């Protein structure tokens, strides 16, 4: 199974390690910015790109990198043969008149990057914290319309949401692999596939 992690921030990078522990091939995708290139280079060297005192996280990343089970890239072409895509990117917050409002423009742009690439039967899991209705009103239509334009069956992609649950610290990796997950799907099939993914394709998830 090939898994793509979109967004290699503090959570996405750790999720990449967690997902590859069960010998899945994982590719983390990050933007080719100056910071993004540093993250990509670090992961491909087997070094966690952020400060952490979790020895298990650092050790496993080094091992997985050497085994070519986990790598990082800026190429969107990796989405083309992915079986699962995990979205782990931030939504922009903008302050106006002393109020914070969420701007989803960059988030939608990120979704479009893989929506035009993925194949039928791909499972998309949103780990990002998003406003209620985002999956149904924004993400699902973007992928659906892309499938129509590409003459693919719009019923043959699966969308689920399972928000990130992490506890940074010396047991950071364990907090990902040994924590209860809450999940929901755009339909029953998507929900079932999401559950099966976390249950069978990652290391020691609880349900």
Predicted regions mapped to residue ranges:
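Hydrophobic/small residue at the entry helix of a nucleotide-binding pocket
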Residues: 11
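Conserved N-terminal Rossmann-fold NAD(P)-binding element of oxidoreductases
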Residues: 4-7
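Conserved N-terminal Rossmann-fold NAD(P) cofactor-binding segment
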Residues: 25, 31-84, 88-101, 143-151
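Internal alpha-helical scaffold of NAD(P)-dependent oxidoreductase catalytic cores
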Residues: 22, 141-162, 166-207
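Structural alpha-helical scaffold elements that stabilize or flank donor/cofactor-binding regions
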Residues: 77-79, 117, 175
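Residues at the starts of beta-strands that form the adenosine-phosphate
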Residues: 2, 25-26
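Gly/Ala-rich phosphate-binding loop of Rossmann-like dinucleotide-binding domains
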Residues: 16, 20-21
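Rossmann-like NAD(P)(H) cofactor-binding subdomain of soluble oxidoreductases
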Residues: 93-165
